């Protein structure tokens, strides 16, 4: 293989950074995660997949709180995501200590994207093999962002990442409306996950977080069971 296939900072003759493409492929092979923005909040949901039926699924996390007003989920390599989650949490803490208010979501996303991008042009490292969905609320309203290994980010009304992303996005395009409220958004997120779920969908192998009234919360197993009984 050519040097450009291995070198992180070497462009191929066609103008591609191949290692970033490999990282994007790794992110796309992870379990499905998705986000839905409502008029009064944001929902993010993800499939949890253990490597063995003997593993305790409650110790596996796919949705994380970053601060009181923001959380995220991911698809791809779990340890890579944890590095980004820790960095995002530190950024939120520093902002609170400095300005005595929650960090704006757009500013947090830019900070995370800088870290993503830094690992695409430095020697001795590799790109992060995961994509993130960030959901939060600030003085400008509710927000849903997607970040990719290249450091690129976008805002979305509804989107998905992971191996089931194409089918999930098609389902969301058919079901999403601009008037959707948070309860319907939770149902839509779970129905979308269920469409491409690998096996039986339960409260133990699914995780959901939502932003309601400016605060981010993780749904409990009991809350998830109630929602799953309704779909």
From Swiss-Prot:
Keyword NAD (UniProt): no
Top-level lineage group: Eukaryota
Listed transmembrane segments: none
SUPFAM superfamilies linked to this entry: N-terminal nucleophile aminohydrolases (Ntn hydrolases)
Family matches, as InterPro entries: Ntn_hydrolases_N (IPR029055), Proteasome_alpha (IPR050115), Proteasome_alpha-type (IPR023332), Proteasome_asu_N (IPR000426), Proteasome_sua/b (IPR001353)
Sorted UniProt keywords: Cytoplasm, Nucleus, Proteasome
Subcellular location: Cytoplasm; Nucleus
GO annotations of cellular component type: cytoplasm; nucleus; proteasome core complex, alpha-subunit complex
UniProt keyword Ribonucleoprotein present: no
GO terms classed as biological process: ubiquitin-dependent protein catabolic process
GO MF term (any one): endopeptidase activity
Family: Belongs to the peptidase T1A family.
Entry function: The proteasome is a multicatalytic proteinase complex which is characterized by its ability to cleave peptides with Arg, Phe, Tyr, Leu, and Glu adjacent to the leaving group at neutral or slightly basic pH. The proteasome has an ATP-dependent proteolytic activity.
Subunit description: The 26S proteasome consists of a 20S proteasome core and two 19S regulatory subunits. The 20S proteasome core is composed of 28 subunits that are arranged in four stacked rings, resulting in a barrel-shaped structure. The two end rings are each formed by seven alpha subunits, and the two central rings are each formed by seven beta subunits. The catalytic chamber with the active sites is on the inside of the barrel.
Protein name as annotated: Proteasome subunit alpha type-2
